[in-house]
Amino acid sequence: PQMAVIWTPENRFRIWFEVEAHACDAMAELGIIPKAAAKAIWDGGAKAMAALKASPAAEVEKIDAIERVTKHDVLAFTTWLADYVGPDSRFVHQGLTSSDVLDTTFAVQLTQASDLLLEGIDKVLAALKKRALEHKHTPTIGRSHGIHAEPTTF
């Protein structure tokens, strides 16, 4: 279940928003867009993310409906986001390509998935260590070149 959540549209859209909003922060720091606009994007985005969390299926369907018209996933998302952000949404995605957003999001998702896998590996290693210590002195048949050899222990 945890791994599946990483690959849901809701998580993908949440990461898209964060990528877009952080890009706006950077552009505001450089004086490319007003700092107030970056704040408005975060504020409106927080409302959008709350709506996405409260009614994921309905909000994803809204984005999907826009995409069926625009034939463009990121444009559909930014259009949906604009309903929550308002006039300052014109600064969202400015200076970015869709690949900037998609590739960064994919990297974040891979990191999230890797973290889960590493957590699982730690549990497997702990279980293996426990079993190895438990059977440290358990006798077994040794093998050499695929045939039985002298007895040994695990």
Q: Which role does the model predict for each range below?
A:
Residues 1-154:
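A helix-coil-helix interface module used to build multimeric assemblies
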